[in-house]
């Protein structure tokens, strides 16, 4: 057969090449037919199948309600902005491929944002600290443990293992970035190849900052892992440049989208920060609590974190809308189903009782007054001798002022070692390195020498270093010395805490032997170490830590100043080189040339308020004032100096600014008006009058002979007038603020029918009337307020505002309001009304009188007359131009800190409209609080030209007298 075929082909003479051509023609025809079938006949079906369409619901964000003052001035509003969202909508062959893809997308977006000055914004509690180390931005406690539970995927904190619950920031980043987490960085056999990294747009190595930012993004994305097609917001309020760049690169950024959003904008006024608070991304525990009231809160919800924003959260928060969309496998929206659209509903608006113009002006008044007091106490010296033993005489050495610039981080000492540091900064750093080596040699000796001296035998400088290391660092900051493990009755512990009659080495060695040392904080081999090995590991850890500890470095600079190793002029010049001050201010050249001394320079800058008291955080550095409408209990001003710029805390939070506020020694986050409690001083004598007259131990005809020293108790209590006031009655006693008179009232109230005195009897009467006038409870004000404390010991001193009495300025303002109204005790309020977004009133907040003090009118008459006399006899109110009634108070702290100055009162005296409470912490005397009150009265009643009150410079008149 084969032969026949061959003969056939020979016969028809067809060439082999012809056969090949025929075969190729046949195959091509088949291929064309198949392509026609695929592209023309079934093309749409295959395209539809490839697109893998998915229908999903998409959230339409609502806007938050606005906040206004009592006059309709905008305090908190919303502005249009753009946010970046990330959605995991990909399909992957493996977990490794998934992590590479998501990390690559995250890295590309991160670099686009960073190149345009934008940043990632997620609720994450790990940051890079000043030393470039991973650190938590919250203290140990519930919030941090909840964060740990979220990172380790545990629904309950109690489910955390001991290791997880004690995890450091480093350990948590290692977990998240490693194989168990998001595989951002892998090592050894698991390491990514160069080809894998390149193909996914990732570099061969990542900085610590990059690892942190990628961890933030992946963590945020993981919170929606159970809802894969729900996007999370990873950056807010981004620039137009970032918007354009991301849209341009969107084909490479699967799951990334730009969405219209709104961001919060506050009035540019630091005085409003503590009242308004700020918004931020909700934490897990916050979401858990809020979802009990409204289950619709999303994982990336923005909520009120403090202040009115927090208190009114559920009212201000709008209701999100939604729509159904069809998307392809790349996340591109193909269709919007308008029939399913639910429109978002804006949050309700809130109107406050606050007058924002008063608030701002009073803030300025307090700042000017505090600066004036500070200036009057600064002297050209290195140190102050506290052996003078008189708080009223305390002076502030100029060297303390120079040091304060470093101690309170006005100057950033970590910048001294930067490559681009100025010549002055480099010189300071070179001197610091020499000092640091000397000190480390000494500390190493004290930790390792055979018989180091007891701490009490060291000089003051070394004592401060060693005390800082043990108490501030190892115990309070790092928790290496466990407070809970210490036996406080132990004799060795007592040696350390009382007179330091023990060396640091001996104390730490003993602590290790008693298991007071938490080895897990610095060693992974704790179970295998004896006490000597524990101590050696601790020593190594300590020296290494101190090299990076900014707070310890600040101590070294303090003593470098004292030793004149560095000068005040050098420190002041750095203010310019770090941008704290402008070189165009007219002082730079004079300071740099030496024609202006550092002393004169600082005095000038404090006077002009270019350097504020709060920045220095010396004493005084803070003050507060609260004004109420006596007819309603409305709070018209609630001022805490220093405040803060809440615009820098919302949207893309300025983390450096937040960290600065959190560590600022003037405590701007601590509301001085509603959270700071202190003894009321002689302002409390009005309550003592009510108690004494109501209980019948005195009346308006009772005269008591003030001899200058009340000796019926031990120790005797001196009147401020040590020569005595002689025979005086109640109105004079209030006017003169006679300690003796009110000591006698407290003593009489503690006597029984036989004249026997009982502390408890006297205190119970005081507590009864404190409760009547509302001093035993919070005021009802809608921001964070500390609980008051009515004195429960030292009965007789308690009647002159000492003992253990402690109240906030807001509580003293309610007290003043009750006095002004002859007994009406209001729940104070910051809220006027709520409206919807169209202005329709939903709720009006009405005055709430919680009690009326049941006292005869003649008692009130005596009190009002006495308080009127107080103001008439205080020169600080000379020329005020209206009748005011009030009571001064000076609360003693101790001989190492200036007294607090206070004033409570109301005006006009005959027909009160407003009540006021002013406190200047460490303000030396009540006279300084009176001067602030005088300025406030002049402003709110428009008694003089505003410019003469709000001068913009430190007040030039101060008071050294209290008379209370």
Predicted regions and their residues:
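Membrane-proximal periplasmic segments of bacterial cell-envelope enzymes
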Residues: 2-605, 615-624, 643, 746, ...
């Amino acid at each position: 057969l084969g032969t026949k075929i061959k003969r056939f082909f020979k016969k028809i003479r067809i060439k082999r090449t012809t056969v090949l051509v025929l075969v190729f023609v046949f195959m091509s025809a088949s291929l064309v037919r198949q392509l026609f079938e695929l592209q023309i006949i079934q093309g749409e079906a295959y395209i539809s199948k490839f697109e893998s369409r998915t229908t999903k619901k998409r959230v339409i964000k609502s806007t938050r309600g606005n906040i206004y003052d009592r006059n309709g001035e905008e305090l908190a509003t919303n502005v249009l902005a753009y946010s970046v969202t990330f959605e995991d909508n990909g399909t992957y062959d493996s977990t490794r491929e998934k992590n590479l893809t998501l990390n690559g997308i995250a890295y590309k977006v991160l670099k686009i944002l960073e190149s345009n000055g934008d940043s990632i914004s997620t609720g994450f509690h790990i940051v890079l600290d000043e030393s470039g180390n991973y650190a938590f931005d919250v203290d140990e406690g519930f919030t941090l443990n909840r964060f740990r539970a979220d990172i380790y995927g545990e629904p309950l904190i109690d489910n955390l293992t001991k290791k997880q619950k004690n995890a450091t920031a480093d350990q948590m980043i290692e977990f998240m970035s490693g194989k168990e987490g998001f595989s951002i960085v892998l090592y050894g056999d698991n390491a990514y190849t160069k080809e894998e990294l390149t193909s996914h747009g990732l570099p061969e190595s990542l900085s610590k900052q990059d690892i942190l930012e990628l961890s933030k993004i992946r963590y945020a994305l993981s919170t929606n892992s159970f809802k894969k097609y729900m996007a999370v917001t990873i950056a807010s309020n981004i620039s137009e440049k970032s918007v354009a760049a991301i849209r341009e690169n969107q084909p490479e950024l699967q799951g990334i989208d730009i969405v219209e959003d709104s961001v919060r904008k506050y009035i540019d006024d630091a005085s409003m920060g503590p009242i308004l608070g700020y918004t931020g991304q909700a934490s897990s525990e916050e979401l858990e609590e809020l979802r009990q009231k409204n289950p619709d809160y999303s994982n990336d919800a923005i909520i009120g974190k403090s202040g009115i924003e927090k208190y009114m959260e559920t009212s201000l928060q709008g209701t999100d809308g939604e729509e159904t969309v069809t998307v392809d496998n790349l996340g591109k929206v193909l269709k919007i189903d308008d029939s399913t659209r639910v429109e978002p509903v804006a949050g309700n608006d809130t109107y406050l009782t606050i007058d924002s113009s008063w608030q701002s002006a009073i803030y300025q008044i307090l700042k000017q007054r505090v600066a004036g007091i500070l200036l009057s106490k600064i002297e050209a010296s290195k140190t102050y001798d506290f052996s003078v033993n008189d708080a009223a005489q305390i002076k502030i050495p100029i060297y303390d002022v120079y040091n304060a610039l470093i101690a309170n981080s006005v100057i950033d000492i970590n910048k001294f070692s930067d490559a681009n540091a100025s010549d002055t900064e480099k010189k300071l750093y070179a001197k610091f390195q020499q000092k640091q080596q000397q000190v480390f040699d000494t500390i190493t000796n004290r930790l390792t020498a055979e018989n180091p001296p007891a701490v009490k035998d060291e000089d003051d400088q070394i004592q401060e270093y060693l005390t800082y290391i043990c108490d501030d660092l190892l115990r309070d900051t790092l928790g290496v010395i466990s407070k809970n493990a210490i036996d406080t009755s132990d004799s060795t512990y007592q040696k350390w805490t009382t007179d330091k009659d023990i060396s640091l080495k001996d104390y730490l060695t003993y602590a290790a032997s008693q298991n007071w040392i938490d080895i897990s904080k610095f060693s992974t081999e704790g179970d295998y170490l004896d006490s000597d090995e524990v101590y050696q590991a601790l020593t190594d850890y300590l020296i290494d830590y101190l090299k990076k500890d900014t707070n310890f470095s600040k101590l070294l600079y303090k003593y470098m100043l004292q030793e004149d190793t560095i000068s005040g002029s050098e420190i002041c010049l750095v203010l310019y080189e770090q941008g704290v001050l402008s070189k165009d201010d007219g002082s730079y050249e004079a300071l740099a040339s030496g024609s202006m001394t550092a002393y004169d320079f600082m005095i000038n800058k404090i006077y002009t308020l270019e350097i504020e008291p709060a920045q220095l955080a010396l004493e005084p550095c803070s003050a507060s004032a609260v004004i109420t409408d006596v007819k309603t209990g409305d709070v018209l001003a609630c001022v805490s100096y220093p405040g803060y710029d809440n615009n820098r805390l919302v949207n893309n939070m300025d983390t450096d600014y937040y960290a600065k506020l959190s560590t600022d020694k003037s405590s701007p986050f601590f509301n001085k008006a509603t959270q700071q409690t202190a003894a009321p001083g002689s302002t409390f004598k009005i309550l003592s009058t009510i108690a004494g007259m109501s209980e019948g131990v005195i009346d308006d005809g009772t005269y008591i002979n003030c001899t200058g020293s009340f000796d019926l108790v031990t120790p005797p209590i001196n009147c401020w007038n040590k020569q005595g006031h002689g025979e005086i009655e109640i109105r004079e006693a209030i006017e003169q603020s006679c300690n003796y008179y009110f000591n006698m009232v407290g003593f009489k109230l503690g006597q029984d029918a036989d004249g026997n005195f009982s502390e408890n009897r006297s205190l119970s009467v005081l507590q009864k009337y404190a409760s009547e006038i509302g001093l035993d409870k919070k005021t009802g004000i809608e921001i964070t307020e500390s609980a008051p404390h009515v004195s429960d010991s030292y009965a007789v001193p308690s009647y002159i505002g000492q003992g253990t009495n402690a109240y906030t300025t807001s509580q003293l303002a309610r007290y003043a309001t009750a006095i002004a109204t002859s007994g009406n005790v209001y729940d104070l309020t910051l809220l006027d009304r709520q409206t919807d977004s169209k202005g329709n009133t939903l709720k009006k907040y009405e005055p709430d009188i919680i009690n009326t003090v049941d006292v005869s009118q003649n008692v009130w008459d005596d009190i009002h007359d006495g308080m009127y006399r107080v103001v008439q006899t205080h020169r600080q109110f000379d020329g005020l131009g209206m009748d005011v009634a009030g009571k001064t108070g000076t609360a003693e702290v101790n001989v190492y800190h200036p007294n607090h100055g206070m004033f409570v009162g109301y005006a006009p005296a005959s027909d009160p409209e407003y009540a006021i409470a002013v406190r200047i912490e460490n303000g030396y005397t009540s006279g300084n609080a009176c001067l602030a009150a005088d300025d406030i009265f002049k402003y709110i009643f428009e008694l003089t030209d505003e410019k003469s009150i709000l001068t913009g410079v430190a007040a030039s008149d101060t008071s050294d007298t209290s008379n209370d």
